[in-house]
Curated annotation (Swiss-Prot):
Subunit: Heterodimer of subunit A and subunit B.
Keyword entries, A-Z: Disulfide bond, Glycoprotein, Phospholipase A2 inhibitor, Secreted, Signal
Protein name: Phospholipase A2 inhibitor gamma subunit B
Phylogenetic placement of the source organism: Eukaryota, Metazoa, Chordata, Craniata, Vertebrata
Cysteine disulfide partners in this protein: 22-46, 25-32, 39-67, 73-94, 95-100, 120-145, 138-165, 171-191
Pfam families xrefs: PLA2_inh (PF02988), UPAR_LY6 (PF00021)
Originating species: Elaphe quadrivirgata (Japanese four-lined ratsnake)
Signal peptide: 1-19
Length: 200
């Protein structure tokens, strides 16, 4: 259960100062309807995203809508790979006003696993800020090594750690500090360039 919670948090890309109202929801599957909520003063767009967690032969998809910032709208596809057999990826789309009623939801294209010759240390710690690292082969657009440490969590979360390959778009999103849903927690994020795989 905690692993699924981690994946949800990972995929919640909450994405300057007029106030707008955006629909908020998170559901398993591809159709998401919820309630309207006034966004923060620095949030000027609504964001819909579809996130997929893949661990062959299983795949879990969920869709969410929330507030965001328009300076992250171009970061519309992100992916990460903390384990050789586990992939996390998300597609995002922005909208405002009536456009949100007609904009088609973002759709993830079928996953094609293509190693790109890079590697990073990878691991997931569901209840700790530390985890046992091992080398992970990066795929597709993953050219960064991402480390996320969740400290001082609120009552609904435990400490967590995540290390693995990631796309540059995901690192740029974290630079924008999009995690409004973790305001009560301390989150340390670091990205470094992935390194070429060494021959065995």
């Amino acid at each position: 259960m905690k692993f699924l919670l981690f994946c949800c948090l990972f995929g919640t890309f909450l994405a300057t100062g007029m106030c707008i109202d955006c629909e908020h929801c998170v559901v398993w599957g591809q159709n998401c309807t919820g309630w309207k909520e006034t966004c923060g003063e620095n949030e000027d767009t609504c964001v819909t995203y579809q996130t997929e967690v893949i661990r062959p032969p299983l795949s879990i998809t969920f869709t969410a809508k929330t507030c965001g910032t328009s300076d992250t709208c171009h970061l519309d596809y992100v992916e990460a790979n903390p384990h050789t057999e586990l992939t996390l990826r998300a597609k995002r789309a922005c909208c405002t006003g009536d456009e949100c009623q007609t904009l088609p939801p973002p759709v993830l294209e079928p996953q094609v696993n293509r190693p790109n010759g890079l590697q990073c240390p990878g691991c997931i710690g569901l209840t700790s800020t530390e985890c046992n690292e091992y080398l992970v082969s990066c795929q597709g657009s993953e050219n960064q090594c991402l480390t996320i440490i969740l400290k001082k969590p609120d009552f609904s979360l435990s400490e967590m750690s995540f290390k693995g390959c990631a796309s540059e778009n995901l690192c740029l999103l974290f630079e924008k500090k999009f995690w409004r849903f973790l305001e009560a927690s301390e989150v340390d994020v670091k990205c470094t360039p992935a390194v070429p795989q060494t021959s065995q």
